[in-house]
Amino acid sequence: MPFKITITEDADRQLRFLPAREQRILEAAVQARLEHQPTTPTRAIKRLRPNPLAHYELRAGGLRALYNVEGDEVVIVIVGRKVGNKLVVEGEEFHGHQDDSVEPPGKRAREDAE
């Protein structure tokens, strides 16, 4: 039975931040690799060190999708581009392992503006 793929509102916005070509590459990788065995480690799927946002990473060239598996559903929570050893999300460096109060880039700025 295939897993249901969902994407959070923040991750969808992060995906739309990427150029159209990169969006298509990442969307194709998500469909090809996460529908049937999203937790099986491969060259493209990696289990992450413990952090509050995501348990797995999908790699598609220099693109990354961080996600969790909840029952029969794959929930994509972060989308970005790997630059060297950094993950860049919406043009900002993402720090996912610094503390337990980690939030995706852009979320703090939106909350401050409200």
Regions found by a protein language model. Name each.
Residues 32-59:
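A short, surface-exposed loop/turn module that caps and links secondary-structure elements
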Residues 1-2, 38:
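Short helix-capping/hinge SLiMs at alpha-helix to coil transitions
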Residues 13-24:
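Surface-exposed, Lys/Arg-rich phosphate-binding patches that contact polyanionic backbones
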Residues 3, 14, 49-51:
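Acidic/histidine-enriched, beta-strand-rich ligand/metal-binding domains
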